Amino acid sequence: MQSFVHKIWYQGHPAAWLLLPLSLLFWLVSSLRRAAFRLGLKRSERLPVPVVVVGNITAGGSGKTPTVLYLIELLRREGWRPGVISRGYGASFDGELDVVAGMSPAQVGDEPAMIAMRTGIPMVVGRNRIKAAHKLLQCHDVNVILCDDGLQHYALERDVEILVIDGERRFGNGWLLPAGPLREGAWRKNSVNFVLCNGASAEADEYAMTLEPTGLVAVAAIHGKSQAKDNSHNAQDNATPRPGDTVNAMAGIGNPQRFFSTLMAQGFVLEKAHEFADHMAFSETDIATIDDGRPLLMTEKDAVKCREFAKQHWWYLAVDANLPPTFSTRLLDALNRAATAKQGNTHGL
């Protein structure tokens, strides 16, 4: 089903025309909603600390999570105290939930579980981003909030908007959901503060972002605490797959082919490359269908969901976002201006 949808969105399949009436309805509803905020019929809430929203305007993966991880590291290095709020897509909870490293994706969502495991950052998930932000401020000492995947959540006033684009697929056929991949029209690109192009060539008004592989990590080495300061499991040993080895691969993300292409670019020979649905809750049985004893490589997001039943020959490819220094400089300048406007000083150092 997922591959057929991608044919409609990105390969010009004629079935898109059958969905066009629904896209027109989607356009009408979303336009009225934006107009309600613009005219003051609905109110956006302003928070006492700067808010950075990271999102996209297409359905599926574009590189938001690596971007959030990059921002966390950047802000901590510069002396800020960041916290994260997220929708917690796919998780089962009521209200708002304080995320602790080691919580499962079923509890808090795929991306929050991965971010918490990697960084140990203060984080709250909730369907209502404003309530999540208030809980974050009440429970943690943070002075800047990163909103993961909140570009269309207009009830939350933001100081900086960062749009992440898949550089290869970009906006597909240019149509709104469900006939196309767009949550909002391509015009939205012109209203944000920063546009990051993940992969391929960036346009003149975009910052080029690449995802740099940093090595393979044993899935079985993931444990119930933050991995932020623990790199002992990254050491290469004789069992670690190396370029030229024949491996199997799996991915349950928005764009599995990007992951498979990355593995091949690293020199791995893919015997099997299996696509799972995005946000799939894996069981040991699911993996058994593709596991023939060869090294099995997966994404970090999938690894967090498979850690409870991981085998010794399962590995995930760790990646870090790489962005030009000009982006970091301009982002920090924007945050300092926002903090000054809100609090009469910079970031409280």
From Swiss-Prot:
Pathway: Glycolipid biosynthesis; lipid IV(A) biosynthesis; lipid IV(A) from (3R)-3-hydroxytetradecanoyl-[acyl-carrier-protein] and UDP-N-acetyl-alpha-D-glucosamine: step 6/6. It comes from the Bacteria. GO terms for biological process: lipid A biosynthetic process; lipopolysaccharide core region biosynthetic process. Its EC number is 2.7.1.130. The gene is lpxK. ATP binds at T58, A59, G60, G61, S62, G63, K64, T65. It comes from Shewanella amazonensis (strain ATCC BAA-1098 / SB2B). It catalyses: a lipid A disaccharide + ATP = a lipid IVA + ADP + H(+). This is Tetraacyldisaccharide 4'-kinase. Belongs to the LpxK family. It is an enzyme of class 2 (transferase). Keywords: ATP-binding, Kinase, Lipid A biosynthesis, Lipid biosynthesis, Lipid metabolism, Nucleotide-binding, Transferase. GO terms for molecular function: ATP binding; tetraacyldisaccharide 4'-kinase activity. InterPro entries: LpxK, P-loop_NTPase. One of its GO terms (cellular component) is plasma membrane. NCBIfam families: lpxK (TIGR00682). Transfers the gamma-phosphate of ATP to the 4'-position of a tetraacyldisaccharide 1-phosphate intermediate (termed DS-1-P) to form tetraacyldisaccharide 1,4'-bis-phosphate (lipid IVA).
